[in-house]
């Protein structure tokens, strides 16, 4: 589970900013929103408010950047991701860290880099303990050799392999060492280096980021009758008018004609890469955009099977395509995986959860999410403008956060819990009145020409 994130000199975040999922021990409401791991109570939800251009989206982008950097390398566009409110920030270090739990172990992993040059200046991984102490598992400084903690005892075989990996990596200023220790390397269940695999796996497979520009995702739904029954049952609860969701098989040529060539080529390259990763390929993925919804299923080395969805509406004689649905209905399909997913220990990060949704539908979605995952290690962190859900009956005070820009155009993050409001306080009203900040401040404007 996510414990804490911190970021500095990234997008609109100039000075170090921090968001924590550790619960306050003074708040008694919604106790089921907490999960206890060892002696630490972690929150399952974080809702982030702020005016337009306050930096809310940049918080969501932090997770995308962090995951992309670990899994695929620091992206080329990172050269423009330093905080641009000060000239010196271009050559200043940026810092990124997440604290997480894997099983019942707590870790802090992070790195620093000069983004304008995509130059890694530091990297570290610590194991954290309940008494507040920490043990450095490995660290590196710039292009120097990564250093393993002296207290980690390796077998001769492991020691020789690790020294080889370090020798090969020494001098590298553009890559991270954590993914290097997971590139084609296998670990026995008794290995003292398992933390490399465990932390990397959590970042790669347990953070799910939902943004409009994330078209390729892995889903287990829309492929068989049982999952379709669940989807049909679920979609009816949202009063969209849809009475049935069906799948329809199409050819690769039809898929090619429905997509821009660049998008189709990129998708097929992704399929090819996935097939090459496995001796006997078997996977499913969904290709999704504002107007398209396609499922791709691969079994063995045969041609991928492609399906799309068709929709029936109440009292209608005709089927509808995905592109004929409203923005709100299409948005629901973006979020459906969050309700159906039964995997343990998943962090969902969603930018503008309420986009295109009616306020009551947003509230209903959150109620269902909380109800369906009440017993699971599953977290949801999302940004929103929807003040109607700023309600202590829905969220705890320590789950509500604000992002605000200061006079220097830099963003800061702070929690509602610092205001110590009464439990009967109408939070949404106080927020819109400006009590907590993080709302637009308008200047006057006169259409009349000056004389």
Region locations from a protein language model:
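A short, compositionally biased
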Residues: 1, 91-95, 114-121, 301-308, ...
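Switch/communication elements of ASCE P-loop NTPase nucleotide-binding domains
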Residues: 1-70, 305-447
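Conserved P-loop NTP-binding catalytic core
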Residues: 34-36, 41-47, 51, 60-118
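Short Pro/Gly-enriched beta-strand edge/turn motifs at strand-loop
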Residues: 77-82, 288-293, 384-386
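Short beta-strand segments that buttress and anchor functional surface loops
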Residues: 96-101, 125, 309-311
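Residue-level detection of beta-strand-connecting loop/turn positions
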Residues: 104, 132, 315-317
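Electropositive, glycine-dotted interaction segments
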Residues: 108-267
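Extended helical coiled-coil dimerization/tether regions that scaffold
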Residues: 213-324, 435, 444-451
